[in-house]
Regions:
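Short amphipathic alpha-helix used as the core "switch/output" element in two-component signaling
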Residues: 71-83
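A short, hydrophobic beta-strand element within the central beta-sheet of small alpha/beta folds
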Residues: 83-93
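Acidic, metal-coordinating helix/loop segments flanking the phosphotransfer/catalytic sites
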Residues: 41-59
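Conserved acidic segment of CheY-like receiver
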Residues: 9-22, 26-30, 60
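Short, flexible helix-to-coil linker/hinge segments that flank and couple to helix-turn-helix
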Residues: 98-103, 113-148
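Non-catalytic signal-transmission and effector/linker regions of two-component phosphorelay proteins
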Residues: 1-12, 146
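Active-site residues of response regulator receiver
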Residues: 58, 62-64, 90
Length: 148
């Protein structure tokens, strides 16, 4: 079962991070990929929602610990009429955080610093409708939750 309707063609992206250096680095990385187009960078949750709405972004990559971020921001974004795919990004692998992000409607939770060249591949999986959890120990936790 796919979580979202897969995106076809160009993937428009809003990057939301309260550290502009991180946002710029992510934009630079995705800008090297022919199928990604960063349409906006935001530093607050409100700005991320406004940018996603204005540009009808297919994907929002957001720091889940920035002011106005987290599960509430994910709910606001997936509640937009065009329902963008939301990928959460965090410097910490805290299971409580990533499970709340996914429960709020996020399609991914990715760990900063472990992505490098994998980020475009993982984000493509998200926009194809797959759930992506790039956090150490996530598979074991999910197995425990699903076991009888």
């Amino acid at each position: 079962m796919l979580l979202v309707t897969p995106v076809r063609g160009e993937i428009t992206v809003v990057i939301a991070d309260d550290d502009p250096r991180v946002g710029s680095a992510l934009a630079g990385l995705l800008g090297q990929e022919p199928d990604f187009r960063v349409v906006a960078e935001a530093t607050t949750g409100d700005d991320a929602v406004a940018a996603a709405r204005e540009h009808r972004a297919a994907l929002v990559l957001t720091d889940v610990r920035m002011p106005g971020g987290g599960p509430e921001l994910v709910r606001r974004l997936v509640g937009l009429p065009h329902r963008p795919v939301v990928a959460g990004l965090s410097a910490q692998a805290d299971p409580a955080t990533w499970t709340r992000v996914l429960a709020a409607g996020g399609s991914a939770h990715l760990l900063e610093g472990t992505l490098a060249g994998d980020l475009p591949v993982l984000l493509r999986r998200c926009v194809q409708g797959h759930l992506v959890v790039g956090v150490p120990g996530a598979a074991d936790l999910v197995r425990r939750l699903l076991s009888p």
